Design a protein with these regions (language model features):
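Active-site-adjacent beta-strand/loop module that shapes the phosphate/pyrophosphate-binding cleft
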Residues: 20-28, 113-132
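Nudix hydrolase/Nudix homology domain
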Residues: 5-8, 30, 70, 81, ...
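Acidic/glycine-rich phosphate/pyrophosphate-binding loops and surrounding catalytic core
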Residues: 50, 100-113
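Conserved Nudix-box catalytic region and its N-terminal flanking loop in Nudix hydrolases
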Residues: 2, 37, 46, 53-91, ...
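Short loop segments at secondary-structure junctions
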Residues: 27-28, 49-52, 63, 127-131, ...
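Acidic pyrophosphate-coordinating catalytic loop
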Residues: 10-14, 65, 110-121
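Acidic, metal-coordinating catalytic segment for phosphate/diphosphate chemistry
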Residues: 7-46
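Short aromatic/basic micro-patch
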Residues: 73, 123, 146
Length: 180
């Protein structure tokens, strides 16, 4: 017999998450409590464009307060609770990179932290980019960093790229392109 959720208590909420305290019924009859974060989901984008040295990806350098450091990562963003996945991808691409894409290819979904959150991330390869900026979030300090895909694949394998969603997005993109 597996654990099952006996009750869920909504503890706190925001526009983009809900914090719950769940009571779990264990197989032996005991109960335990665990925190859980409900999340509407997010998109992860691999904006790819041609360059003289092969395909390059529009990466971001962004400060992440939880880590208290600036990291290199793919553009990504939280969707609204009822927002369409592709509409979210189109919006986030314009907000974070200042570009729109004529072609989006789904690269699958991932659960980035299933031990604490139900957040689901949808990965997209975004191609045929043209400038089309939208204002971004006021609290985001983002630097756009175009980088060769080959270099990013190496960084994903050697540990210099540490953001999990970015590692997965880069490796899935490289695999997708190799299958063409």
């Amino acid at each position: 017999m597996a654990q099952k959720i006996a009750s869920k208590l909504l503890w706190q909420q925001d526009d983009s998450w809900r914090l719950r305290l769940d009571t779990l019924q264990l197989p032996d009859g005991r109960t335990t409590q665990k925190g859980a974060i409900e999340h509407p989901g997010a998109v992860v984008l691999v904006p790819l464009r041609p360059s003289a040295n092969g395909p390059e990806v529009l990466m971001l350098r962004q400060y992440r307060h939880v880590l208290d450091q600036t990291i290199l990562e793919l553009p990504a963003g939280t969707r609204g609770w009822e927002e369409d996945w592709l509409a979210c991808a189109q919006r986030e691409l314009r907000e974070e990179t200042g570009h729109r894409a004529e072609k989006f290819t789904e690269l699958g979904q991932i659960w980035p932290a299933p031990g604490i959150s139900d957040e689901l991330m949808q990965l997209y390869l975004a191609e045929a980019l043209t400038p089309a900026p939208l204002p971004g979030d006021e609290d985001e300090m983002i630097e756009l960093v175009p980088m060769p895909l080959d270099e990013l694949v190496t960084m994903a394998w050697n540990g210099r790229l540490q953001d999990a969603k970015s590692i997965i997005g880069i490796l899935r993109t490289a695999h997708h392109l190799a299958q063409k």
